[in-house]
Structures are given as structure tokens and as C-alpha cells.
């Protein structure tokens, strides 16, 4: 394995916190870096966590890490309500994510992993604000031409402490009683999504990624993050 250092943006969110926990639990990454507005609620000798309230500085801090990360995971995301309106959400979910990707490319990051969303390029869905933000980031990452770019498109995220749509997420989360496949087609557990992101990054490093720009849809998230997951 040549991949030694990983960095995580969005390390305190639902999926990002699980990506961080997964990275700290396996031997593949002896060094893990994070930059966030508040420090993650975990500690490890492997972890270097930087608290920076000004997110505009995050991208530029990548090149200051030693050793420099060879893979960056971007799980940054918020809601319109939490951001205080669509304009502020756009600054975070679109502008900030693109800025971080550009900074990662300039810093020599080889593999960039982005947590996007399922169905965003559908005939109707592509015109929704959420989809426009995610599509913009996906396209920017593709244009940056990383050695490996990995886009995960999960469905509804299950297992969050503070669900964005508690009733709907509880309904989807309970569908496994009718059959795991039904639930898998609509939403995935946050831990499964995180493990799929890490597994895909490992595959890219091992030369096993199916393509340079790899879109991991829901079925492959379940396969990589649950059915075939190995620590």
C-alpha cells in the first residue's frame, strides 16, 4: 500500500464522523488529518485534528500537513435550515466543496472522495437546488482530473442522531423488516456509506478501481460497505 495519510472534511457530520472512525480503526492509514469548525469527538495517536472556524481557510491548510495526504474525503453537507437559507447552503455545499477540491489538487492529492447523493441527475431532480449543488461539485471534481476521483451517491442516510427528516428516515430504516433489499434501494446506514468510501479509496490505491472517475451508486455502496467489507 502506498497510501499513508488521509484527510477528512466534514468529520463531525453523520457520514464524515463515520469515515473518520473507520480510518482510525484500520491499519491502512497510519496518519489521519481533519479540519473542521469544531473538533471531532474522538481521539487517537493517528489523528491530527485542526479546529478552524473560518472554512475559507480549510483548503489552503491541506498543503501544510506533514506528511501531505494522498487521499481526501469530503463529506461536507448542511441543510437550508441549518445554514440560514439557500444562499448560505450553496456557499457550503457547493462553493466550499469545490474550493476544497481545487486546493487538494494543488496540494498533490492523488485520490479525492466526495459524498454526493442518489438520483441527482434525474430528469426532474436535476433542477432541484440540492441536485444542482451536488452536480456542480461532481463536475468540478471530474474536471480537476485527479489520479482517482470517487463519487459516492447514497440514498437516504440512516442512523443519524439528529435526522433531517426523522419520520421518513425511521420509515426507511424500518423497511429491513420487510426485506433488507427494500431498505437498501432507498437508504443506507451512515456506517455502511463511510466504509464504502474507505473501501473504494483502498481499491483505487491498489489499482482495482474500475475507472479513473468512479461513481459508486447505492447498490455498490451496500456491497463495498457491508457485504464485502473487511477491516
UniProtKB/Swiss-Prot annotation:
Q: Which domain of life is it from?
A: Eukaryota
Instruction: Check the record and name the InterPro entries matching this protein.
Output: Epimerase_deHydtase, NAD(P)-bd_dom_sf
Gene3D superfamilies per the record? NAD(P)-binding Rossmann-like Domain
Name the UniProt key words of this record, in alphabetical order.
Membrane, Mitochondrion, Mitochondrion outer membrane, Transit peptide
Q: Transit peptide extent?
A: 1-46
Q: Which GO terms describe its cellular component?
A: mitochondrial outer membrane
One GO biological process term: import into nucleus
Presence of the UniProt keyword Transit peptide in the record: yes
Task: Classify the protein's membrane topology as the record does.
Answer: Peripheral membrane protein
Compartments where found: Mitochondrion outer membrane
Family in the record: Belongs to the FMP52 family.
Its recorded name reads Protein fmp52-2, mitochondrial
Amino acid at each position: 500500500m502506498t497510501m499513508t495519510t488521509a484527510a477528512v472534511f466534514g468529520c463531525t457530520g453523520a457520514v464524515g464522523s463515520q469515515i473518520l472512525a473507520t480510518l482510525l480503526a484500520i491499519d491502512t492509514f497510519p496518519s489521519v488529518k481533519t479540519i473542521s469548525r469544531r473538533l471531532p469527538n474522538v481521539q487517537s495517536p493517528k489523528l491530527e485534528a485542526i479546529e478552524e472556524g473560518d472554512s475559507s481557510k480549510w483548503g489552503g491548510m491541506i498543503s501544510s500537513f506533514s506528511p501531505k495526504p494522498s487521499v481526501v474525503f469530503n463529506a461536507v453537507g448542511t441543510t437550508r435550515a441549518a445554514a440560514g437559507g439557500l444562499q448560505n447552503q450553496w456557499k457550503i455545499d457547493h462553493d466550499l466543496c469545490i474550493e476544497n477540491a481545487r486546493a487538494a489538487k494543488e496540494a498533490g492529492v492523488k485520490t479525492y472522495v466526495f459524498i454526493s447523493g442518489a438520483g441527482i441527475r434525474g430528469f426532474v431532480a436535476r433542477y432541484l437546488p440540492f441536485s444542482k449543488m451536488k452536480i456542480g461539485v461532481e463536475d468540478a471534481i471530474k474536471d480537476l482530473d485527479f489520479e482517482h476521483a470517487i463519487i459516492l451517491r447514497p440514498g437516504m442516510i440512516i442512523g443519524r442522531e439528529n435526522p433531517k427528516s426523522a419520520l421518513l428516515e425511521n420509515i426507511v430504516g424500518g423497511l429491513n423488516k420487510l426485506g433488507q433489499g427494500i431498505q437498501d434501494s432507498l437508504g443506507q446506514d451512515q456506517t455502511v456509506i463511510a466504509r464504502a468510501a474507505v473501501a473504494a479509496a483502498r481499491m483505487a490505491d491498489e489499482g482495482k478501481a474500475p475507472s479513473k472517475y468512479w461513481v459508486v451508486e447505492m447498490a455498490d455502496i451496500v456491497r463495498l460497505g457491508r457485504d464485502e467489507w473487511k477491516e
